[in-house]
């Protein structure tokens, strides 16, 4: 049988208050569903149906494209990779989103789709702080902004996810023989 393992700190067991046990039961329920393959994600219970899974794959592709573009221009931002590795999220497609959702305090006792988890992150993140990294995404940042991203890898990881979730999609370029 699968091993059920929790991702979250469960708190003290001796002082009794009704909320921590309720939270622990909810987290345990999702950990059990995860162990039996009924939900995906590591820290969050995320729907594993076809729509949510397609959204997760699309999110990861956008995240990777944003990260690659920034890293090519500003190699010092590689520290965001370290922040992602240290988060130890096992679902590769959702790992960046789960890591930043945990950083900003998104509620782990809710059942999410990829889209609703992304929206929960956007609702909780510091938008002004995320916008401060915009010059890196536009390719117009100075060395100081790149150094800030390197010094704050978790915050920059949040900015990468924010950019992947909020940037308009670029139109697909196709070649036409008639042109």
Positions of predicted regions on the chain:
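Patatin-like phospholipase
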Residues: 1-179
């Amino acid at each position: 049988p699968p091993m059920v393992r929790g991702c979250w700190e469960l708190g003290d067991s001796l002082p009794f208050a009704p909320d921590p046990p309720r939270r622990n039961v909810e987290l345990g329920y999702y950990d059990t569903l995860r162990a039996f393959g009924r939900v995906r994600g590591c820290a969050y219970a995320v729907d594993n149906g076809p729509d949510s899974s397609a959204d997760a794959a699309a999110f990861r592709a956008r995240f990777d494209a944003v990260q690659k573009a920034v890293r090519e221009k500003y190699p010092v931002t590689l520290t965001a990779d370290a922040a992602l590795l240290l988060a130890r999220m096992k679902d590769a497609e959702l790992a960046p989103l789960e890591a930043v959702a945990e950083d900003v305090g998104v509620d782990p006792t809710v059942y999410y789709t990829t889209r609703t988890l992304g929206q929960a992150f956007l609702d909780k993140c510091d938008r002004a702080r995320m916008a401060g990294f915009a010059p890196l995404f536009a390719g117009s940042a100075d060395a100081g902004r790149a150094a800030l991203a390197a010094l704050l890898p978790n915050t920059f990881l949040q900015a990468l996810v924010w950019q992947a979730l909020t940037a308009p999609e670029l139109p697909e370029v196709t070649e036409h023989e008639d042109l």
